[in-house]
Amino acid sequence: MTKLLPQLNSDLGELADLVRKSLVQVSAGRNGAGSGVIFSSDGLVVTNAHVVSGKGGRRRTPEFQVTSPSGSVMAAKLLAKDDDLDLAVLKIDRTDGSTPDLHPIELGNSKALRPGQWVMAMGHPWGVAGAAVAGIVIGAGDDLPDHSSEGPGGGRDWVVVDLALRPGHSGGPLVDHHGRLIGISTMMAGREVGMAVPAHVIQGFVEKVLAGESGFS
């Protein structure tokens, strides 16, 4: 036991450091908007639709700024967003010839999640860069009860977790014990209940955007 806790503490710190390499801050001008995750080495960033939207779901601007873990500020353009899925895809602009060192996150298997499994969410709550919070999976899938605005459900796929998400976590990664992406943190459904869009839904959305499918705002 005396060695177990120090080892666990070290492992969790290393895991947070690993995930933090793929975590970015997304902003529109001077206004901090939320978090995002580097999805591919060519500059795709995934976040929540509400992070890149103004009041009433209106698009803030097609131009955004993405701040990397090292503090580099890069221009990015909004490729597409889906308000129903609460997902958006940005593309880091490299027209100036820059080649930023991007660290895309590894995808996990969100369909294999089970209640009781350990997860970690990362983001920028209260302006704290790369803050981490951990918990366990409560449930996952599309068969969760519908509690309208008070909880998960509505026939959508969700990952529901026992941890306290804060506004700055929106758009940030939810990862498993290997640091693999299993969801994008989206909202709170209760005092200590967080909700995330599963990784397989994210991957499907990105594939449709890259294939040029229409129907996205």
Q: Where are the regions a protein language model picked out?
A:
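C-terminal cap/linker of serine protease catalytic domains
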Residues: 1-16, 76, 121, 125, ...
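Catalytic-histidine neighborhood of serine endopeptidases
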Residues: 2, 40-85, 94-95, 200
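A conserved glycine-rich beta-strand in the N-terminal activation segment of trypsin-fold
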Residues: 6-14, 23-44, 72-75, 132, ...
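Gly/Ser-enriched beta-turn/beta-hairpin loop segments
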Residues: 18, 81-85, 91-99, 128, ...
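Residue-level recognition of beta-strand microenvironments
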Residues: 26, 41, 79-81, 136, ...
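Catalytic nucleophile loop of clan PA
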Residues: 37-38, 118, 164-184
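Flexible, gly/ser-rich surface segments that form the specificity/activation loops bordering the active-site cleft
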Residues: 51-57, 80, 105-110, 115-154, ...
